[in-house]
C-alpha cells in the first residue's frame, strides 16, 4: 500500500556553510543518488544573473575535464535547469565534491541539496446520481453519512478544467477516460506509457467516467516515476515546472488560465526544501495542488511536498471513517479523504483496488476540479474552500490532526 512503495521521511540538516550557501545533508535512511545534487539560487537572482552563473559553471567544468587524470571519473555536470514563476531558479546534475565546494562559494547560490529517490504514495441542484458505485470513496464524498452506495454530483462534473497528474503516466486509451486523457511529458524514461499502473489508478479517481469524481475533467499525464514507481527528486521538480508552464498557458498565460487547472502529486520522499519551494511557486502561480500526506504513520512534516503549507495535504481515511493505519498525520494535514481499498483504473482496460494516501489525494484533486467547474475560485485558496465544506467525521485522526473529511456539498 502506498506512498504504493514507502519513502523514508527524514529532515534535512545543514551540513556546512561556505560563504553563506548551505550544503544540506540527507538523513541516514534517504536513498541518495551518488554525486547528484540540486542547486537552488537566491530568490533575488535575476534571469540574467542565473544565465551568467550557468555559463561560469560550464566553463569551470570544462577546465576540470581538461585537467582530469585518466583514472578519475568524469562527472556529467549540469543536466537540467528550472525556473518556476520567477521565484524558484535552480539546476541539477552530477558533480564531484570539489565542484560542489566551488558552487557553494558562489554568491548567487542559496543552498545545495542532495538528489534522492522519490516514490509513489500507494499502501446541490441539478444533481446526477451514480448508483451502486464501484468504489466506496465516491459515495462517501457526496454524503455526510458513511455506508452509502450512491454518488451525487452536479452534471457540470469538472468540464473546462484540466488536471495534471504528476506520477507514473496514464493509460490514456483506457475506455473509462472516454478520450479526455492525453499524454503530456515524460521526464524519467523513453516509454510514453504507464508501465506501473499507479498513475492510471490515480487519474481514474480524479476523472474517470465511472470511477472518478470529476467526470468531465481533462487529464494530462506528466511522467516522473518509472515502471517501479520511483524517480529522482530533480526529475519530479522538472515535471512540476513543465506542468506549471502548461497550466499557465505555456509560460505566457494568465492567472485565469491557471485557475482552471489542478494538479495531483501522489508521491513523496524525504523533506526537501527544493521540492517544497517548487510546490510553493506553483501555488503562487494560482494553481491548486493536492498532495499525498505519506504512508509512514508519522507526522507529515517530514515528507515533501506534503510538508509545504501552500499545497492541500491529504491524509487517508477508511470506509468506517477511521484514520488508515498507514496514513501520515499532523498539523500540516488539511483534510482526510478515502484512501483504503479504493477501486480505480488499471492499464489495459481493467481495474485494481489499492490503498494509500496516493488514493486519498486524487479524491481531493477531483473534488477541486469539480468545484472549479461549479464556479468556485481556483488556486491555493480552493483548499480553504474544501476545508470549509468538509465535515467532522474522522475518529482518532492522530495527534494535532484535523478530523475533517471531504464533502462535495451535494446536500445528501
From Swiss-Prot:
InterPro entries: PCSK9_ProteinaseK-like, Peptidase_S8/S53_dom, Peptidase_S8/S53_dom_sf, Peptidase_S8_Asp-AS, Peptidase_S8_His-AS, Peptidase_S8_Ser-AS, Peptidase_S8_subtilisin-like, Peptidase_S8_subtilisin-rel
Glycosylation sites: 123, 126, 252, 264, 408
Subcellular location: Secreted
A single GO BP: proteolysis
Family to which this protein belongs: Belongs to the peptidase S8 family.
Keywords (A to Z) from UniProt: Glycoprotein, Hydrolase, Protease, Secreted, Serine protease, Signal, Virulence, Zymogen
EC number per UniProt: 3.4.21.-
Positions of the propeptide segment: 21-126
Domain Peptidase S8 span(s) in chain numbering: 135-412
Name this polypeptide is given: Subtilisin-like protease 6
CDD domains reported for this sequence: Peptidases_S8_PCSK9_ProteinaseK_like
Gene: SUB6
Job of this protein: Secreted subtilisin-like serine protease with keratinolytic activity that contributes to pathogenicity.
Record: active site: 167, 198, 358
Residue stretches making up the Inhibitor I9 domain: 36-120
UniProt GO molecular function: serine-type endopeptidase activity
Residues making up the signal peptide according to the UniProt record: 1-20
GO cellular component: extracellular region
Chain segments annotated as transmembrane: none
